[in-house]
């Protein structure tokens, strides 16, 4: 019932697509950014592992607190804003990925990591609130399982796909714009559906 509900409810379906793209990019980032820092900047494994995560998660900590508070305040007047915030977060986060692969100073790369982490939190903060807005309470756990299973199945492909791209292109720099494009597409889809279906799907289960 969880999969059926998620895949037949437009808002939940697009949320799942967005979540799949979200996890795909995060998995690709976590897998390959340490290697990128080692190859491009000569960092040790320990330094590359630390720098790939530290700047991102420090910024994400601030981002998730801001996004959660902002969503709760605005959603009182217009609940679809939660999905709007998710879509905007993906699009703005994607912008930083396009710069990571460029020929920039290391400190600028770290700023991009932080910017990406800050805006990814806008998606994080609203995942389950959006899902539960448009799915029946009796199926919340089943729908969550469907969303998570689908997202992780798609995300698991990222290391292989990016690895194949690296082999064909000779470096990792070209993979970051691809990750950015994934988030932009997902973000646009979420903005569209938040406007066309969110309230309708909410009303169906809250009559």
Where are these regions (language model features)?
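Conserved glycine-rich helix-kink/hinge and helix-boundary motifs of the Major Facilitator Superfamily
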Residues: 16, 49-50, 87, 141-145
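Cytoplasmic membrane-interface "Motif A"-like loop-to-helix N-cap segments
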Residues: 72-89
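Hydrophobic core of transmembrane alpha-helices in multi-pass small-molecule transporters
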Residues: 106-122
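A late C-terminal transmembrane helix in Major Facilitator Superfamily
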Residues: 132-169
